[in-house]
Design a protein with these regions (language model features):
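DPxDG-like acidic metal-binding loop motif
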Residues: 28, 95-119, 140-142, 150
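Short beta-strand-to-turn element immediately C-terminal to the catalytic PLP-Schiff-base lysine
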Residues: 35, 139-141, 145-150, 261-265, ...
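Glycine-rich, charge-dense phosphate/pyrophosphate-binding loop(s)
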Residues: 208-303
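FAD-binding core of FAD-dependent oxidoreductases
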Residues: 12-14, 18-25, 92-102, 130-145
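Alpha/beta catalytic cores of group-transfer enzymes, especially the acyltransferase/condensing modules
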Residues: 117-164, 251, 257
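Acyltransferase
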Residues: 164-241, 245
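Solvent-exposed alpha-helices and their adjacent loops that cap or buttress functional pockets
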Residues: 14, 23-26, 75-76, 129-130, ...
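ATP-binding N-lobe of GHMP and related small-molecule kinases
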Residues: 1-93, 111, 115-117, 295-298, ...
């Protein structure tokens, strides 16, 4: 029998102005084991997020992505497969739960196939499954990633900030489906808004690489997606304001939401920032919890 243990990080896409382009990995992890067994069929054990409804069939990304690599390398060799998941990444909250499942499955199958594919090749497969690379890239590589498509092929550049940052992820109880969140975004935007975001995304990368974090307050601003999604997250403008008033550089919608993520200095009072944001959600009849996180710099790995 063959078995592999995988750790895969949560991710936060967009990072404010970098819609469908920028992403980061943080130190909140799902742990998954994949075991090839003599017993036919698929078995699944889940602890934590999704334990009450994840099944080993249908659209289960952890199985489907595993089989995508396994079948391509082994020419469809039939196997029994047992998967055990310890899920800490909240589902449908904008922290990359689907990307973590995709990347875990691809990486596990690849490990059991003697690393047949490179990570860059896995990025291409993951993007085909997910539809865009901004979450799967940081899950694979760790750090901050800048992703782009060229001739229908995904590419990503990993970078590490010059100085540490803290990320305060405030997670409302209410889920927000990516499909619904995407429907809120118009198909066209004013040219001036596109220019606005280009300048902010460029400033964000420059601030991270140079360590000039005083620019993050402005660099994390956005006009391409967050204004159109704001009505889907109760009290969002006030949550942003509370984060900044409590000492964060700024706050953004993490991925498609509903999580709101504040960026802060390690010297900031992150508990104060988190509680200020939680209090605003509570004032809008929305319970929320929070995680104070660091950047993950490794991405998916065997443990």
């Amino acid at each position: 029998m063959k078995k592999v243990f995988i750790q895969v990080p949560a991710t936060s896409a967009n990072c404010g102005p970098g819609f469908d382009t920028l992403g980061l990995a943080c130190n909140l992890y799902n742990e998954v084991s994949y075991e090839i067994t003599d017993r036919k069929g698929f078995q699944l054990e889940v602890e934590g997020e999704g334990a009450d409804y994840l099944k080993p069939f249908g659209r289960n990304l952890a199985f489907a992505s595993f089989l995508r690599v396994w079948n391509s390398v082994t020419c469809g060799q039939r196997i029994g497969l047992k998967v055990k998941m310890l899920n800490r990444i909240p589902m449908s909250r904008g922290l990359g739960s689907s990307s973590s499942a995709i990347v875990a499955g691809l990486f596990a199958a690849n490990a059991l196939c003697d690393d047949y594919y490179t990570k860059d090749e896995l990025l291409g497969i993951a993007t085909e499954i997910e539809g865009h690379p901004d979450n799967v890239a940081p899950a694979l590589y760790g750090g901050f990633t800048i992703s782009y498509m060229e001739q229908e092929k995904a590419h990503s550049l990993r970078l590490l900030p010059a100085k540490p940052l803290k990320f305060i992820a405030v997670v409302p109880d209410s889920k927000l489906l990516t499909s619904l969140s995407r429907q809120a975004i118009p198909k066209t935007v004013p040219h001036k808004d596109a220019v606005y975001n280009t300048s902010r995304a460029s400033l964000l990368v420059g601030a991270l690489l140079s360590g000039n974090y005083e620019y993050l307050g402005m660099a994390l601003e956005d006009k391409l997606h967050q204004p159109y999604r704001a009505h889907l997250i109760p009290g969002l403008p006030d949550v942003f304001a509370a984060a900044k008033e409590a000492g964060a550089y700024n706050a953004i919608i993490s991925g498609a939401g509903s999580t709101v993520m504040a960026y802060a200095s390690p010297e900031a009072d992150c508990e104060r920032i988190a509680k200020a944001m939680v209090d605003v959600f509570a004032a809008n009849n929305e319970h929320a919890c929070y995680h104070i996180l660091d950047l993950d710099t490794e991405g998916v790995k065997k443990i």
